[in-house]
Regions:
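Bacterial N-terminal signal peptides that target proteins for export
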Residues: 1-8
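Secreted/extracellular ectodomain signature
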Residues: 22-210
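Bacterial N-terminal signal peptides
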Residues: 8-17
């Protein structure tokens, strides 16, 4: 086959959807993202099931539904690290965030301002970017992924009467050097207006447990 005929044949296959160019969208292999928005009531996410449903809804909107999406959140009886599967996890751009649960909770994880993207492939308002700063992520977790004492009443309280442990999606902020992605400081409350002053908008991490 001549080069010209080969090119024509290849283009024909792509047009028919046979070639790899149309085989899958960029979100198909995504197994990790930061939520692009809070469901609307701050730390009241409807418990873990409501938070998981929010992850699924956002993922489905960009063609990444059909996976077992889990919010990276701890409660008084559940550790975040135990509910997100075994890994590896990839962001929407195909970058591997971590190869395993142990890797995710080690200094080797690849969560950075450039890789901790939302489901649309956009970077949240991290330090040095657009304002207001929104790098705080709800986790209710310690650095090792176990439950902390602050979980917005197990993610059912969107008021000023409870608090949540927050991580920094950009790994920047409170202390010099690299900050923890999942456990840096407590919130000032669990209402959206309480999350904003320290640099948050009620976003959280979603992982595929498949």
């Amino acid at each position: 086959m001549t080069q010209a005929r080969y090119v024509v044949a290849a283009l024909s296959l792509v047009a028919l959807g046979v070639g790899p160019a149309l085989a899958q969208g960029p979100a198909d292999n995504m197994t990790f993202f930061v939520t692009s928005a809070n469901p609307g009531d701050g730390g009241n996410l409807g418990g873990l099931s409501g938070a998981d449903a929010h992850c699924e809804s956002l993922a489905a909107a960009v063609g990444a539904g059909g996976k077992t999406w889990r919010a990276y959140l701890s409660t008084s009886t559940v550790d975040a690290r135990s509910r997100i599967g075994a890994g590896p996890w990839y962001n929407v751009g195909g970058v591997m965030i971590a190869s395993s649960v142990a890797d995710l909770h080690s200094v080797n994880n690849k969560i950075t301002p450039e890789t901790a993207l939302n489901e649309k492939g956009a970077s949240p308002n991290y330090i040095g970017g657009p304002q207001p700063n929104q790098h705080d992520m709800l986790t209710g977790s310690n650095e090792n992924g176990t439950a902390s004492a602050m979980t917005c009443n197990n993610w059912t309280d969107g008021s000023a009467n409870s608090m949540a442990t927050l991580g920094h999606g950009d790994r920047l902020g409170r202390t010099e050097g690299v900050n923890s992605w999942n456990s840096v400081h407590p919130s000032q409350g669990c209402a959206l207006e309480n999350l904003a002053p320290t640099g948050g908008a009620g976003m959280f991490y979603c992982f595929s447990a498949d």
